[in-house]
Amino acid sequence: PLGDERYSVIDGQQRLTTLYLLHMYLYGNEPYTFEYDRDDSNIPSRSEYLKNIASENEKTADKNIDFFYIYTAYHYISDFFLDDKLKQSFRDLLERPKDQKSLQVIWYEVERARQYETFRNLNSGKIHLTNTDLIKALLLNRVSGLPQVERMEAAAIFERMERDLQNDHFWYMINGNELREGQTRMDFLFNLVAGCKQSDYDIDSRWSFRNYFNDSKKENLSQKWKAVRHTFLRLKDMYDNIYSYHYIGGLTYNSNRNPINNITRWLALNRELTHSEFINRLRSEIKTILTRKHKAITEYSYYSDKKDLRLLFLMHNIETILQRFEQLHEDERLSLENEYEKFPFELLHRQSWDIEHISSNTDSDFRNSADRKAWLESIKQDLGNEYTKDENSKIKELEMIYSTSEKREDFNRLYTAIMRQYDDKTDSIKDNAPDGKDKMQIGNLTLLDSSTNRSYHNALFPRKRRYIIVADGISDKSDKFESSLTPRYIPPCTRQVFTKAYNKTNKLSLNAWTQEDADFYVKDMEQKLGYYFNNEKI
């Protein structure tokens, strides 16, 4: 209370304004008056506009966003009360005493010292209208929205678009960014149509509503809605095509800082070019990135930029999927009309991915004694009798020293001795090979999710292989070790590495990843990625 029957409204201004407009329409006079602290002195006050609402027109409503909504609400009320009987029923509700069926206003008076605390408590946890909510309401508004013949169809199409964008397969092809509070996936579509930049959207999630859809100076609502539908259908066509899906998804993953700008550019190209020209342009963009620092696949190594390596391995997986699809599609006996597999970009964005050494790196990276103990136990299981042979007296001696001291430097010496012996006995890829084909070469690297990679630390190849196969879904539930592992998505090429699918000779050994295995693996990369590095035709 401010005295003299004046009150400061903490919460409920919209409800009071709605009641005011109802009363003005039903009785033609003010039930109370408003004073606004933030009225612009350069335009008529909101209180004056409310007072004269019955005589205001659409032209004056366009001067101010508040005037527009007040005007719209008043005319919605007038349309609602076209039936005089309905108008009288509402008057009866207002005029009856409170002990009869009537409308009463309830309010709470708060001490001035507690007004800010009360406001916070009242609004805590409220769900505010999003940009999408506002645009949907604008389009479907009975008074000022789309023409009546379009509204019903628009409501159904709007719902279908929202549902399709909730499909993670579709969404992560075009955008891998995490949405902030108040942002929606439909906003992305509206931003594309409105020409909203990513930087503008990050600052104001309602930018496209304020600056385009609610701007009466721009095209009419029907034209704007048509642009939304056409843009969505073009995106959906890109998703439905196995080639554009994979190439756009790969480029989005590689450069996800500015998805609005990227998709805007690709949409423009898609409108201008034929389908085959568009696919060629996408592949050309990928080629430029892959060959920016490396002119050949064998120039890549563990020391290359990790972002570049991730794209290289991603494209190996993508081209493996696409070329397999082409082989099956060309076989008339199979009658394959649609794609049979799509790379799940949502998992690329949601999970963390490592560049993994197939044959473990010689350097020890164990952070605590528990990890070191677990690794030693796994080594004894994997090597079996080889570990306890008399010739391994040096290893036994180092193990005794470490078991007594538990010092990291003593473990590192033991670890190095074990790894060197393993490499020597199994033809595993060596460290510091004179021809440069060491453990840092591209043929000893693959893409693996961080969780699986770090779960087995620097395990030997046989154990890594078992981890990968079990994580990929082939497990024995009665086996304690295998049942403890969490199923994960294993990219096709990573799976083929650890199952040694690239080595088709009859000399195959499952005890280690050899240089021969690495050479066959790189050969497949060169074949699958030939267009990007050898200027082969598409």
List each model region and its residues.
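Flexible coil/loop and intrinsically disordered segments
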Residues: 1-538
